Amino acid sequence: AISGKDITSREALVLFDAKGIDFQLVGKVADYLRKEKVGDTVTYVVNRNINFTNVCIKQCGFCAFSRDFREEEGYTLPIEEITRRAKEAYTYGATEVCVQAGLPPDMEAGLYENICREIKTEVPDIHIHGFSPEEILYGATRSNISTKEYLSRLKDAGVDTIPGTA
């Protein structure tokens, strides 16, 4: 690994299972390679997560807070509250909002796009990191279009990047 060349899956598993002094050596090599590649500069973003609904059809347990639409604890924020939270985040120095939520059973086809347009209207300079791959698939399905077309629409609506979770 210290050569900087790609390693095999089997070699990665060996490194992943390292214990004791070997674990410390893996860390030292990783730190050396990082320093060679990018130096000591560390960057970050000030981010606010806006989970606009916890109502979800999946019941997968990933987020641990989802609710069935019939449950009392289920909520869906109005777009005005979502944009208020984005503005508040920006006021406090956030450069990015992460917009994610459950998959509500009665979701309008254009909901995700509308949320992004409203956020960008109110806070044009904020970076929208929005919608998990599962939400994108769900939005495309609800809109009866391909995921490629749906991603294009989300980009046009203001999504800057997408998370890789869920």
Positions of PLM-derived features:
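Conserved Radical SAM active-site core
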Residues: R67-A166
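A broad, low-specificity signal for short, low-complexity segments enriched in glycine/proline
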Residues: D6-I7, Q59-G61, V123-P124
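Bulky hydrophobic/aromatic packing residues
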Residues: F16, K35, Y44, F62-F65, ...
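Generic short alpha-helical segment signal, independent of protein family or function
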Residues: D31-V38, I57, G61-D68, K87-Y90
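Flexible, acidic/Gly-rich N-terminal and inter-domain linker regions that tether
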Residues: A1-N49, T53-I57
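Canonical Radical SAM [4Fe-4S] cluster-binding loop centered on the CxxxCxxC motif
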Residues: V42-E81
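A broad, structure-centric signal for solvent-exposed, well-ordered loop/edge residues
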Residues: V14, D22, I57-Q59, R84, ...
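Conserved, mostly hydrophobic/aromatic
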Residues: G4, A30, C60, V99, ...
